[in-house]
Amino acid sequence: MRKLLPLLSVLVLVLSACGTAEEEETTESQEGEVEEITLEVATLIPPMTEILELAQSELEEDGINLDIVVLGDNVQPNDALHNEEVDANFFQHVPFMEEYNLNNDGELTPIESIYFANYGVYADEYEQMEDIPEGATIAIANDISNIDRSLQLLEQHGVIELEETDERYYTQTHIAENPNDYNFEEVDLLMLARMYDDADAVVMTPAYAEPLGLTPAADGLITEGTENEFAITLVAREDNADSEPIQKLKEAMTSDEVRQFLEDNYSETAIPAF
């Protein structure tokens, strides 16, 4: 009996060691698993949607499921983000976001500038800005940040002159000189493309010009360039801006793959801003 005791002790130690090894293996396996996180991002149209689709596959490797929420107008994405229905949005420039914050007590914040949408003036019947006759109607977007943007573009090319102001945005009240007596008709951003046949000229982004078969390089009477604050930007909220999923999304959207995609497919209309 005494001889059996040491043998039993050894057997217990062996079994205990096996049990510990299995537990450690299970723990390591569990720790090795990446918990999947769903990140919802509101957006509107290409190339915004396409850039997010490119980011999807890269985020999958980090255990992040990117849910692209395509909405129908330029109001819903900010409302959805403000109300915490989505985690981020990708459709706007920073002045547009700032105006939303001001009017809605919002806490939206820019994460990363992705590309410049080369703003321009387009006209069906005229090939140069100088050809547009006196008293003509030029359609511009009706939200304050894009009124400002349109007027700055026109001043940049000497079409109008704006008076100095301490206000955040230029409006039509700040037009000091309008030598051709142009009438600037303010319409909803999503209506600009429809105004191409009705107005003498339209000021709009490439995203709305492209369905009409127009590009800034080939058809823009004047264009904006990249020296401005109007890059299309990834936006989140102050409470989640520094979170790992949002930062991973930023990295995925500023990859070499995204840059190459824009250069290959949107060289005239979406200029990388990163």
Give the location of each predicted region.
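C-terminal motif of bacterial Sec signal peptides marking the signal peptidase cleavage site
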Residues: 13-17
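Alpha-to-beta junction loops
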Residues: 82-92, 136, 159, 180-183, ...
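Periplasmic-binding protein-like
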Residues: 148-155, 253-273
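A bilobed periplasmic-binding-protein/Venus flytrap-type ligand-binding module shared by bacterial periplasmic
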Residues: 118-130, 231-243
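Ligand-binding "clamshell"
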Residues: 99-111, 126, 198, 203, ...
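Bacterial signal peptide processing site
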Residues: 19-22
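Short, well-ordered beta-strand elements
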Residues: 34-46, 64-70, 137-138
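Short helix-initiation/N-cap motifs at beta->coil->alpha
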Residues: 68-79, 167-194
